[in-house]
């Protein structure tokens, strides 16, 4: 968010920012996003806040909290992450498969003052048919400027941030239902000075430390890289881009894997004549 601004977290992915030193504070249950500020705003010297919300929450009950803010004429901006997956429950598609254009029309009908659509694929919005009249599309690099402009508007405004969940992209690429980008990014350890600016710019977990005789440097973990490429926004000459059908070498020995597997006994299955419960970690 812009320097000096304040934001409120949501649930699920929107809550993760609570622990990331991003000037986000407070949270609520699903469907009550923004309600705390609606009440607080009339007693506060703060002029405006941002409220985070996921697309799954929006479909479930979040639209009601936006309606509440509009009815109360509250000056705030809802930031809706349209990441094309209900991450809280396992990455399912949104109920009803609403498009960004449809959401913008719904928000316009609810009385939202202005809608900004921010995306990493701005070329797919060359046709603006079906979008709300009070909506505009921006490249994600302009997100700070857009937030500053919306914070000046009296009333309730909305940002729809359209970018598919990185984990979901990797799943779809492995399944062959999403094209695998031909470009891979690497870091030349001989040039890297370990400043970490690539991590600051991208906030990406695929930038991993690597210890060298000259100290700690950085490398790109290709197994988790989601091909976002924002790491190259870092102020650094060490990045190397390779394009084409690149095959990475295995970092393990097939014979070793087979040797380990040969020593693993088959599981002993219980004789079941009633219900049997198994606890599995994760969602």
Protein language model features and the residues they cover:
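Thiamine diphosphate
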Residues: 6-88, 94-101, 145, 278, ...
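Active-site pocket-lining segments that scaffold enzyme catalytic pockets across diverse folds
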Residues: 1-3
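Short, ordered loop/turn segments at secondary-structure junctions
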Residues: 12, 81-84, 120-123, 163-164, ...
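Glycine-rich ThDP/TPP pyrophosphate-binding loop and its adjacent helix/strand module
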Residues: 85-177
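Short beta-alpha connecting loops at secondary-structure transitions
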Residues: 22-25, 85-100, 127-135, 177-190, ...
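Iron-sulfur cluster-binding cysteine motifs and their immediate structural context
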Residues: 163-164, 169-175, 193-251
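A short, basic/flexible loop-to-alpha-helix module at the beginning of a structural domain
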Residues: 256-277
């Amino acid at each position: 968010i812009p320097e000096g601004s304040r934001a409120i977290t949501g649930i699920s992915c929107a809550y993760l920012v609570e622990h990331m030193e991003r000037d986000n504070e407070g949270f609520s249950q699903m469907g009550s996003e923004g309600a705390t500020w609606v009440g607080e705003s009339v007693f506060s010297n703060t002029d405006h806040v941002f409220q985070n919300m996921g697309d799954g929450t929006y479909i479930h009950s979040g639209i009601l909290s936006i309606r509440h803010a509009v009815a109360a004429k509250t000056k705030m901006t809802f930031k809706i992450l349209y990441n094309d997956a209900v991450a809280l429950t396992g990455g399912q598609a949104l109920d009803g498969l609403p498009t960004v254009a449809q959401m913008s029309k719904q928000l316009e009908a609810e009385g939202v003052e202005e809608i900004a659509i921010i995306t990493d694929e701005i070329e797919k919005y060359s046709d603006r048919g079906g979008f709300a009249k009070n909506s505009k599309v921006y490249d994600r690099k302009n997100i700070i400027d857009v937030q500053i402009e919306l914070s000046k508007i009296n009333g309730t405004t909305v940002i729809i941030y359209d970018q598919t969940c990185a984990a979901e992209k990797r799943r779809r690429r492995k399944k062959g239902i999403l094209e695998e980008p031909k470009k891979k990014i690497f870091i030349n350890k001989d040039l890297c000075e370990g400043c970490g600016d690539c991590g600051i710019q991208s906030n990406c977990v695929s930038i991993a430390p690597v210890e060298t005789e000259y100290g700690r440097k950085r490398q790109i973990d290709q197994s988790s890289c989601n091909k976002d490429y924002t790491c190259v926004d870092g102020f650094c000459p060490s990045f190397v881009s390779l394009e084409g059908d690149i095959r990475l070498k295995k970092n393990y020995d097939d014979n070793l894997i087979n040797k380990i597997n040969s020593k693993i006994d088959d599981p002993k299955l219980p004789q079941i004549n009633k219900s049997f419960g198994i606890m599995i970690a994760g969602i």
